[in-house]
Swiss-Prot record:
Pfam families: LpxK (PF02606)
Entry binding sites for ATP: 55-62
Gene Ontology terms describing biological process: lipid A biosynthetic process; lipopolysaccharide core region biosynthetic process
One GO CC term, this protein: plasma membrane
PANTHER family on file: TETRAACYLDISACCHARIDE 4'-KINASE, TETRAACYLDISACCHARIDE 4'-KINASE, MITOCHONDRIAL-RELATED
Protein name per UniProt: Tetraacyldisaccharide 4'-kinase
Gene name per UniProt: lpxK
Family: Belongs to the LpxK family.
Catalytic activity, EC: 2.7.1.130
Length: 328
């Protein structure tokens, strides 16, 4: 229902307009206060890069964060990552992730990023505290990438990158809750790069698509072509589950059942195992896998995806960030 409201297919969005005007008024006032320096943002001693979005829901932001961190690491840059840790609840903040940190403590995206990149990752509702925690334990870090947080103006930033779903884009264009917008589309004029996940990019936007890898068994780590798996049940607890189901079909998989779950939904063995019957194979997203690995069955697999950015702009962006991190 929410997708139909935000896309404009359902007329119910009109009933929510008063709340949207209130949301827009408050969010605009907050940004204006920081812009006029009525409120002070904390500036880190190293450059900060924000990877965020203008809309609620999945846009492919986390794969972009992983891509950015890995690309900078390949250039010899020491990167730290901070996040709010949405969906997790730590005993205290900031929380610096370790190999023992669970998604229940830190949230699923931070754990995924930590496992994929081996970069220092810290979470806190106050992102400046997370930055301080990383720099205290890893003083060699040269640049901070913040996963989401475009609207978290308490943390000053050097570079802003926005990720857009190229198919859904901005829906009906209204602020939450009548539409998907956290900020209006005009905000794009002030950011440094716009990355478009799928669809047809517009002038000045960087095209991106998600490239699926081999399926990975949660229990054994065995890899295989996902099309070799039989009697597949697909599960996705991400911001936009249909994207994952479409990716499977693109890989030649015709799931016997597709199970969309809420983003950041808590998972347990009983609920997940009930999704598959004898002889079926469960295939999930990598984001779900970080929550299920501790209690996985032998027939549970996940499909990792990597962000692939096209054109000349990604190289220019990476050069800019490398120089920034190097102090040039």
């Amino acid at each position: 229902m929410i997708e139909k409201i935000w896309s404009g297919e359902s007329p119910l969005w009109r009933l929510l307009l008063p709340l949207s005007w209130l949301y827009g008024l408050v969010s605009g006032a907050i940004r204006l206060c920081y812009k006029l320096k009525l409120k002070r943002a904390w500036r880190a001693p190293v450059p900060v890069v924000v990877v965020g979005n203008l809309t609620a829901g999945g846009n492919g932001k986390t794969p972009v964060v992983v891509w950015l961190v890995e690309q900078l690491q390949q250039r010899g840059i020491r990167v730290g990552v901070v996040s709010r840790g949405y969906g997790g609840k730590a005993e205290s903040y900031p929380l610096l992730l370790s190999a023992d940190t669970t998604t229940a403590q830190a949230g699923d995206e931070p754990v995924l990023i930590y496992q994929r990149t081996d970069a220092p990752v810290a979470v806190s509702p106050v992102r400046s505290d997370a930055v301080k925690a990383i720099l205290a334990q890893h003083p060699d870090v040269q640049i901070i990438v913040t996963d989401d947080g475009l609207q978290h103006y308490r943390l000053a930033r050097n570079v802003e990158i926005v990720v857009i779903d190229g198919v859904r884009r901005f829906g009906n264009g209204w602020w939450l809750p009548a539409g998907p917008m956290r900020e209006r589309a005009g905000r794009l004029k002030s950011v440094d790069a716009v990355i478009v996940n799928g669809g047809v990019p517009r002038s000045g936007e960087i095209p991106m698509h998600l490239l699926p890898g081999q399926a990975v068994n949660l229990r054994t780590g065995t890899r295989c072509d996902v099309a070799q798996l039989e009697h597949v049940v697909a599960m996705a607890g991400i911001g936009h589950p249909p994207r994952f189901f479409a990716t499977l079909k693109m890989c030649g998989v015709q799931p016997e059942k597709c199970v969309p779950l809420a983003d950041h939904q808590s998972l347990n063995h009983a609920d997940v195992s009930a999704l598959v019957s004898a002889g079926q194979t469960l295939v999930m997203t990598e984001k779900d896998a970080v929550k299920c690995r501790a209690f996985a069955e032998e027939n549970w697999w996940y499909l990792p995806v990597d962000a692939q950015l096209s054109g000349d702009e990604p190289a220019k962006l990476l050069t800019q960030l490398t120089l920034l991190a190097s102090g040039n």
